[in-house]
Swiss-Prot record:
Keyword ATP-binding: no
Taxonomy, superkingdom: Eukaryota
The organism of origin for this protein: Aspergillus terreus (strain NIH 2624 / FGSC A1156)
Comp. bias (Low complexity): 189-218, 381-391, 440-450
Keywords: Endosome, Membrane, Protein transport, SH3 domain, Transport
Protein name as annotated: Class E vacuolar protein-sorting machinery protein hse1
Length: 597
């Protein structure tokens, strides 16, 4: 009749802070947060339910209640902040922290949460009650506050040398212990000696290992002799690269980074942590491993009893009083004793499962990176170093260069033009007109063509600009003579040669094919232009069809008579000396047309 009104949040908060939970159930926690945000008086009712759960004597319930309050503070806004900073809630926290029966871990968690809430509410002066309560608890319990983080001092060379020596000593001891692993009476003593050798704190036996583990890591201990450490306090990283952990976490030690900071790995995360926040865990001895294996065997041996109990309960569920059945009662009590061990094994193998999963993910990532690099290297192979080397261009040798083969020895069968003597390498631009529009002067003598013109002119393409191979006699007026020409060609070309890099590829290929088909060439000698000064000569270019030559602009030479045949044009035999051109002797009245008949 006079019972207090039932709080709508009691059931939801009790469900989220159940003592049978092995860890925080965030599904239930978020359900409470959603319910607080949906109702007008949800913040006040939720905090009232939290105060009730803080009075529970179970330490797990108290820890889950503090975690639920922190989740509400982060998700439900100023309304819940006002209720958390109220006098009733802070007094409940102080009362629980000052109780001598409260677990030490619960007291440390209360101090940690009050510090976070003080920093969270610092912007609003109306929530100063939380700060006052935090300072009061901090003053009354100075031992609850975690130690300050040490400074990050660089490791000296002497420290690294000492760490290396300790590592070599530990390796030598481990090698020395291998023969003693056989079952004989000295097995236990050797294991204890190994633990004492690798533990500077002096734990000499399995019985002393547990007290030694409760001590913090000494400052002189190196990471080479320690493989695992256990967290003594919760650590929140304040700088990038620091490892976050909670009290009780076992951290795998990797290496020393600073003087009082080590690098470790926990739940797939790698970072540095301070040594005064952790304690050293010695490697498990043979007795500890045997004890752990025996405990696991006992737990797995009770599986049959659990299944039998479930079968009996399902078949005899219609009986009114189950307590009268002695078999069911005995099975229930025998299986109830293994529950703490089962929870411990669940936590152990859950952590191992997470570690193996993270290791598998790292391996998969490394394999994918390797395959990507391998495919990239195969899709872009290195260019071969062999092949036809590019031939240098030698249109004219420089001053003082020897006349003959280019550097590197003779080249394949290619004919070329003899170089000009030193002197006029290129025509002066101020005295010579454009190569396309240049015509010989009117006073220049006409050059006589061969007496027997070919029946069918053969078209020639421009040769490539590769360096020539064979020499031929030079003309008396240093004009290069042309080879393998069977039509009337001008010894002085009227256009400059192509540069080596600008010769069309089709012309170059056609000229090479023509050189392979023609094996024997007869050089023809032409008369040089005697009236033209050397300074006005253009750079020659080989073999152009006669149809492209301009008509002569001067008088032809006289012909001696109608019956008289023109003097044949001399042809040099291979190896013969150069024969200069001699004009035929004829009168000025001879008919010039007879020359072309």
């Amino acid at each position: 009749m006079f019972r207090a009104q039932q709080n709508a949040f009691d059931d939801a908060v009790a469900k989220a802070t159940d003592e049978n939970l092995t860890s925080e159930n965030w599904e239930y926690i978020l359900d409470v947060c959603d319910k607080v945000a949906a109702e007008e008086s949800g913040a006040k009712d939720a905090v009232a339910a939290l105060i009730k759960r803080l009075a529970h004597r179970n330490a797990n319930v108290q820890l889950y209640t503090l975690e639920l309050g922190n989740a509400l503070a982060q998700n439900c806004g100023p309304k819940i902040h006002r209720e958390l900073a109220s006098r009733s809630f802070t007094d409940a926290l102080l009362r629980l922290a000052n109780d001598r029966n409260t677990h030490q871990q619960v007291k440390a968690k209360i101090l940690e949460r009050m510090q976070e809430w003080t920093e969270m509410f610092a912007s609003n002066p109306d929530f100063g009650i939380m700060e006052q309560a935090y300072m009061k608890l901090k003053t009354q319990n100075p031992n609850l506050q975690p130690p300050s983080k040490p400074g990050k001092r660089e490791i000296t060379e002497a420290d690294r040398q000492k760490e290396e020596e300790e590592l070599q000593m530990a390796l030598a001891l481990s090698i020395r212990e291998k023969p003693s692993t056989a079952p004989h009476p000295q097995a236990e003593s050797s294991a204890s000696a190994a633990a004492a050798a690798t533990t500077p704190t002096g734990a000499a036996s399995a019985g002393q290992a547990q007290p030694a583990a409760s001590q913090a890591v000494p400052s002189g201990t190196s990471a080479a002799t320690v493989s695992r450490v256990r967290a003594l306090f919760d650590f929140q990283p304040s700088e990038p690269g620091e490892l976050q952990f909670r009290k009780g976490d076992v951290i795998a030690v990797l290496e020393s980074v600073y003087k009082d900071w080590w690098k470790g790995s926990l739940r797939g995360q790698t970072g540095i942590f301070p040594l005064n926040y952790v304690e050293k865990l010695p490697d498990p001895t043979v007795e500890e491993l045997q004890r752990e294996a025996q405990m696991e065997a006992e737990v797995f041996g009770q599986i049959k009893n659990v299944e039998k109990l479930l079968t009996l309960l399902s078949t005899r569920s219609s009986e009114p009083n189950v307590q009268d059945n002695e078999e069911i009662t005995a099975l229930y009590h025998s299986t109830l004793a293994i529950r703490p061990k089962l929870i411990e094994l669940i936590g152990k193998y859950s952590q191992k499962k997470d570690e193996f999963t993270q290791l598998n993910e790292k391996f998969i990532k490394a394999r994918r990176d390797y395959e990507a690099l391998l495919e990239a290297s195969m899709s872009h192979p290195a260019q071969p170093q062999y092949g036809r080397p590019g031939q240098p261009q030698y249109p004219y040798p420089g001053p003082g260069a020897p006349m003959g083969y280019p550097p590197g020895g003779p080249q394949p069968d290619q004919r070329y033009f003899s170089p000009r003597p030193q002197g006029h390498m290129y025509p002066p631009t101020s005295q010579s007109p454009g190569p396309r529009n240049h015509t010989p002067p009117a006073a220049a003598p006409y050059q006589q063509a061969p007496s027997h013109p070919p029946a069918q002119p053969q078209q020639h393409t421009a040769p490539d600009a590769y360096p020539p191979q064979h020499h031929r006699p030079e003309s008396t007026y240093d004009h290069p003579q042309e080879l393998s020409t069977s039509v009337y060609d001008s010894p002085v070309e009227q256009r400059p040669p192509y540069p080596g890099a600008q010769i069309p590829a089709a012309i170059h290929q056609h000229f090479q094919q023509q050189q392979q088909q023609q094996q024997d060439y007869s050089p023809s000698v032409y008369s040089p232009d005697e009236s033209k000064p050397p300074g006005t000569q253009q750079v020659p270019y080989p073999a152009t069809p006669a149809a492209n030559q301009p008509p002569p602009m001067h008088q032809p030479p006289p012909v001696p008579g109608a019956a008289a045949a023109p003097t044949p044009y001399p042809v040099n035999a291979p190896g013969a000396s150069y024969q200069a051109y001699k004009p035929p002797q004829g009168g000025p009245a001879s008919n010039p047309a007879s020359f072309y008949q």
